[in-house]
């Protein structure tokens, strides 16, 4: 057990991850000047240990090493030890993760990097056991070796550190050239298609991540090209994930990733960002296919978020841990005996048939409910049930099992509020509200955006994190770009011009704080931020899309709807700046490539003026909101003069005969305005572009 008698400095922090280490015998510092001043004064190397509160292997290393007196003595005597919550300081995490990947060929968390007192790295790794095992060096040996090397061969350490720092500087140098062309659009699809798992959906081999932004790209590629495999790859993946154990069939919501190819055994932690992005992906897939199962999944994700990841103030938690009482997945798995005891023999046996529950289990002797191999039609026939009767029985069973599960010890909740991840959920809720015409989803999104505006924007500066009354760290490009995405989706769900105005103000601030005036692209950190050893520009789309990728898409959206060509020109500059990265690995930049698709493919600019109470206006807006038209922009107001500040090009338009009037422009040519709403709907909805 951890030493509870003498807390270290982390006891004064608000981060759930740092607080998990506040009673370690290690003399931890939070990231800051105090730690580096001590390292310089005492001429000691620095351990920067980075993780997050719901990270399984972070827990393992904490228990094996950071709660261990021998390790603590080594660290306290020979090093300065710094703990970093990667979700609060993604800038620090990003810099040193790149170093770990450079030095070891891999990355992940916990991330443990040894640096000089001037923050230059000379050794890096992820999980270290206390003593050597799993083909990994023991942490005791690593600490002994590095402290001796730092003391006795300082010149060698400094050479390694200097070379590593120089590599980072070179990697972030600006690149110029011609912009991305249509061929990049097709290469992105080809690379995604070549990695597609034709049996179980998804991309690549286990561990398999949902990667919803790849699915969003494929939906847009299908829309713009009609390539039938693109849509199949999306639906196959979404269907497989919804059937798999990665989806919680009792409490809803998706886990972070699958440890196997068929989506059966998840890494059980649930992240806000995954569920936010998957909410968007399933909603868009519903727009394209009208598959009611996708709508059902969206409803269930939102139910889960409301029940388990929402503060009373309307903001959203960050994550739920995978572990309970030291066991991964313990909260979520079942024995067959537990199922039968809860449901009784008849309903229990039926549930076990449907959800793959057996005596031997499918995960370490227990069962993860799933529908991967379920023969539903055969089960209905054998039981003499209609689809409706079966569904009602299974819903009854689910509710009973959820009630039983809630009596178990609940996983640790990381309840900090992150601006960037909250913005992703706001965008997902707003899109769901728009497509499903569901006001309560919009209400949830509005509650969360109000919280951000009231608590996480200080003197006009967007901040990173709120927890327990404390706001911390100046926002990064992700915070601004994701929040811009949220505002634009809120606007499209409500056509409230105030959201468009807020989006424009936020964009101006984003450009002022992050834009590289010399070479183009957005830096990860603001011009007013703490200086690290390198100032990065990130464009790779990992589990979460990069700030530059999201910014490029939103610049085009905002530029198109407001007529501000300078925003479109900035996106074009980004096509040039990031071209070498994207051409080297197109599928790794699938969200960024959405912006290229939008920019190069045919699109319409739609302007609608009319009274908010006019049934004709309501009709055309509802039809446009439900349709999947990813390239088009829609500007809506009651009167043209309302647009004079935000979209001045439309201020001189007029309303014809007091009726709702629709203006449609396409490929730099505008049609005559019309008040024939049925005709306008046909024109706008029937075409692919």
Swiss-Prot record:
It holds the Pfam family Thioredox_DsbH. GO terms for biological process: carbohydrate metabolic process. SUPFAM superfamilies: Six-hairpin glycosidases (SSF48208), Thioredoxin-like (SSF52833). InterPro entries: 6-hairpin_glycosidase_sf, 6hp_glycosidase-like_sf, Ssp411, Ssp411-like_TRX, Thioredoxin-like_sf. It comes from Bacillus subtilis (strain 168). This is Uncharacterized protein YyaL. To C.elegans B0495.5. It comes from the Bacteria.
């Amino acid at each position: 057990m951890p030493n509870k008698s003498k807390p270290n400095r982390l006891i004064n922090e608000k981060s759930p991850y740092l607080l998990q280490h506040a009673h370690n015998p290690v003399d931890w510092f939070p990231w800051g000047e105090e730690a580096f001043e001590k390292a310089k004064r005492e001429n000691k190397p620095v351990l920067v240990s980075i993780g997050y509160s719901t990270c399984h292997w972070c827990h393992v290393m904490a228990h094996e090493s950071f709660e261990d007196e021998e390790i603590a003595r080594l660290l306290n005597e020979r090093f300065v030890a710094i703990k970093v919550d990667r979700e609060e300081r993604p800038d620090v995490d990003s810099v040193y993760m790149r170093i770990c990947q450079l030095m070891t060929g891999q990355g992940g968390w916990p991330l443990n990097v040894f640096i000089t007192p001037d923050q230059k790295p000379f050794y890096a790794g992820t999980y270290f056991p206390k003593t050597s095992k799993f083909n990994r060096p023991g942490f005791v040996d690593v600490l002994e070796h590095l402290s001796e090397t730092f003391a006795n061969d300082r010149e060698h350490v400094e050479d390694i550190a200097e070379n590593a720092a120089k590599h980072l500087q070179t990697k972030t140098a600006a690149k110029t050239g011609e912009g991305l062309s249509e061929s990049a659009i097709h290469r992105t699809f080809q690379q995604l298609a070549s990695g597609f798992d034709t049996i179980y959906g998804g991309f690549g081999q286990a561990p398999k991540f949902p990667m919803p932004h790849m699915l969003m790209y494929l939906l847009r590629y299908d829309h713009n090209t009609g390539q039938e495999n693109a849509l199949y790859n999306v639906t196959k993946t979404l269907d497989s994930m919804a059937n798999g154990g990665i989806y919680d069939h009792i409490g809803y919501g998706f886990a972070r990733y699958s440890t196997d190819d068929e989506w059966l055994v998840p890494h059980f932690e649930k992240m806000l960002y995954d569920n936010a992005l998957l909410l968007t992906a399933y909603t868009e897939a519903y727009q394209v296919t009208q598959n009611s199962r996708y709508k059902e999944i969206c409803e269930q994700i939102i139910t889960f978020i409301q029940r388990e990841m929402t503060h009373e103030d309307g903001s959203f938690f960050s994550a739920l841990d995978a572990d309970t009482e030291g066991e991964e997945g313990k909260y979520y798995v079942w024995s067959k005996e537990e199922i039968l005891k809860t449901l009784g023999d008849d309903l229990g046996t039926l549930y076990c048939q449907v959800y793959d529950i057996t005596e031997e289990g499918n995960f370490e002797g227990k069962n993860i409910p799933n529908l991967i191999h379920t023969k539903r039609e055969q089960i209905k026939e054998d039981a003499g049930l209609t689809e409706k009767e079966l569904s009602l029985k299974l819903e009854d069973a689910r509710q009973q099992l959820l009630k039983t599960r809630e009596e178990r010890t609940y996983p640790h909740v990381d309840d900090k509020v992150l601006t960037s991840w909250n913005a992703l959920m706001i965008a997902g809720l707003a899109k769901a509200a728009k497509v499903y015409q569901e006001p309560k989803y919009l209400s949830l999104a509005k509650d969360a955006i109000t919280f951000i505006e009231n608590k996480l924007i200080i003197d006009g500066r967007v901040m990173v994190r709120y927890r327990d009354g404390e706001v911390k760290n100046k926002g990064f490009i992700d915070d601004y770009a994701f929040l811009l995405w949220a505002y634009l989706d809120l606007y499209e769900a409500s056509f409230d011009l105030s959201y468009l105005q807020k989006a424009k103000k936020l964009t101006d601030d984003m450009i002022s704080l992050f834009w590289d005036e010399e070479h183009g692209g957005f830096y990860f950190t603001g011009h007013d931020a703490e200086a690290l050893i390198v100032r990065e520009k990130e464009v790779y789309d990992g589990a979460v899309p990069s700030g530059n990728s999201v910014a490029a898409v939103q610049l085009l959206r905002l530029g198109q709807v407001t007529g501000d060509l300078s925003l479109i020109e900035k996106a074009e500059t980004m096509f040039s700046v990031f071209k070498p990265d994207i051409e080297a690995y197109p599928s790794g930049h699938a969200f960024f490539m959405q912006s290229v698709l939008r920019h190069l493919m045919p699109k319409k600019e739609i302007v609608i003026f009319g009274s908010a109470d006019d049934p004709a206006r309501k009709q055309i807006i509802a039809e446009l909101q439900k349709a999947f038209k990813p390239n088009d922009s829609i500007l809506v107001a009651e009167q043209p003069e309302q647009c004079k500040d935000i979209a001045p090009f439309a201020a001189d338009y007029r309303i014809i005969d007091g009726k709702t009037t629709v203006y449609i422009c396409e490929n730099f040519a505008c049609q005559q305005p019309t008040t024939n709403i049925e005709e306008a709907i046909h024109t706008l909805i029937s075409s692919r572009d």
